[in-house]
């Protein structure tokens, strides 16, 4: 049985003091959650948030990382740094990284391999744009991104990878793929993983949906057979909203 994973990506929100306040509010509201709960604050908040979540059921994620351990890469953060401050999950290839910072499939793949080699679980984001969807290219785009991201990932490591299907047209727009549509794409992603790693492994990989996930639509999404959780954006910035999603 795959344990659902619900992660809150705070993006570029919350100063360290605001982050601590948010997590303090969240802890009692999610303590009985059946799903795995992950918060993903900005880098500067990670240390403070990690102190607050010690001894709770909340795990720590980071929004990105570089693939090298150290070096002359101004502005970058390495997997070693993240490990030392208690990070367990790293979002890789978010559409905003691809769109604003020129991240390519090749860069995403390097980051995935580096994260795994340092014992971090990547949350690998894939998803199509509105125009790609209109042109009927959803499956082509998403499955290509999935294959590229997983190049070189071993049969042992694939179970430590989480995939997040985030249609770009649904992020922050209030538009959501229907639960049925999302499940179809996620099922195709799982079948692609099965073609690379076998069905047994593919059935262990958790695949989330992301894109305007809210308390109002989470139960419908989670009722689908292949959706194993959610990567939540805006709704994760309000403790009560995120708790409702976690406790769907």
UniProtKB/Swiss-Prot annotation:
Q: Is Calcium one of the keywords?
A: no
At which positions is substrate bound? 9-11, 172, 212, 233-234
Task: Write down any Gene Ontology CC term.
Answer: cytosol
Active site annotation, chain numbering: 94 (electrophile), 166 (proton acceptor)
Keyword check for NAD: no
Q: What does this protein do?
A: Involved in the gluconeogenesis. Catalyzes stereospecifically the conversion of dihydroxyacetone phosphate (DHAP) to D-glyceraldehyde-3-phosphate (G3P).
Record protein name field: Triosephosphate isomerase
The species this protein was found in: Thermoanaerobacter sp. (strain X514)
